[in-house]
Regions:
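Short, intrinsically disordered, charge-balanced linker/junction segments flanking boundaries
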Residues: 325-333
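C-terminal segments of large proteins
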Residues: 311-325
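Extracellular/periplasmic, surface-exposed regions of secreted and cell-surface proteins
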Residues: 1-311
Length: 333
């Protein structure tokens, strides 16, 4: 279910243009699933339309399951933009969002953003430069948030596991703790600063943009190993580490050939990003300085990547093979 209400205001006076927007949004998500499997069918003719025909159901080996989850996201937002004389632009916005996925102490997050623009080519001192069609300088700032996929990671959850208890002559399955509560679970936030330049020349036959950015993500959502006791489960989902990304993006647009019946457009983009894992831990939750991820199947069966503090993300990490022995075994350096 979705609901969004907005109210807009516009004002134009001389060379001044301003518009404002305020709004409210409500989003309710529910997910339901049912699944079943069977095998050893006497024929494939029915496909999935006659699941009960398979022999596995008669043997008590067929599978079946179902689940359901739900979550709510509420937001209040406002945006104001101002422009003067087609030269100077200002945009300011803020969004306050609350999600049922977070802990009781931190369900709400505030996400502001702002940007400035200066269209230099519209200035009076640029009038004599006829080959320049557009030149604009931009700068911006913004904070964004990330919500966990699982809607119940801040709560104590229970599953029927491998533990049983004896009751009136019958062994019955017991409930086991499946997650520790975390009332302080909060938004993973990214703060980004950027500065950019747009340009076009020669009647817009050649143009492009250059953007330089720096982004820092804090409160990374992560499963931390915790002692039991005092915890009832060996992992707690919490906010911990931080990552930094910075780089440059360049785009060039060109129209080498342009006639009445034919136009050739070329777009070239170049980007460089440098990432660095600053930490995997914080004052409350500690982890190793690295974590192995990814993996290969047989016959290697090892991780392929390592996330390590002080190192870039996405690095391959593993054993280095230098050949194969006479017996067909891998030789490792």
């Amino acid at each position: 279910d979705n609901l969004e209400l907005t109210s807009k205001y516009d004002l134009n006076v001389g060379k001044h243009r301003m518009n404002a927007l305020v709004g409210y949004s409500y989003q309710y998500y529910t997910y339901e699933r049912f699944y079943a499997n069977n095998y050893n069918f006497p024929t494939d003719f029915y496909q999935w339309h006659n699941l009960g025909l398979g022999q596995a159901l008669k043997d008590g080996k067929a599978g079946m399951g179902s689940d359901k989850n739900e979550n709510t996201l509420i937001g209040f937002f406002a945006r104001v933009s101002y422009a003067f004389d087609n030269k100077y632009n200002l945009l300011v916005s803020v969004r306050q969002e609350g999600s049922s996925k977070f802990g009781d102490n931190n369900k709400w997050g505030t996400f502001p953003s702002a940007s400035l623009g200066w269209t230099i080519s519209n200035e009076g001192f640029m009038e004599g430069i006829t080959w320049l069609n557009n030149l604009k300088l931009r700068a911006g700032f913004g904070i964004t948030g990330v919500i966990p996929n699982d809607p119940y990671m801040s709560l104590t959850r229970y599953n029927y596991g491998s533990s049983y208890y004896y009751d009136k002559g019958t062994w019955k399955p017991g409930l086991e703790v499946a997650s520790n509560p975390n009332p302080d679970l909060k938004w993973e936030k990214s703060t980004e600063y950027n500065i950019g330049l747009d340009f076009s020349v020669l009647n817009d036959r050649l143009g492009g943009s250059v953007d330089i950015y720096r982004k820092k993500t804090t409160g990374l959502l992560f499963n931390y190993s915790v002692p039991t006791p005092p915890n009832l489960y060996s992992y707690t989902f919490a906010n911990g580490g931080s990552v930094r990304n910075q780089g440059i993006e360049v785009a060039i647009n060109a129209i080498p050939v342009q006639t009445k019946d034919f136009e050739w457009k070329t777009v070239v983009t170049v980007a460089h990003n440098a990432s660095k894992l600053l930490s995997l831990s914080n004052d409350m939750y500690e982890s190793n300085s690295y974590m192995d991820t990814g993996g290969l199947g047989e016959p290697i069966s090892v991780s392929t990547h390592r996330m390590e503090e002080g190192r870039p993300l996405g690095e391959f990490y593993g054993l280095k093979s230098v050949g194969v022995s006479e017996n067909g075994l891998f030789l490792i350096e």
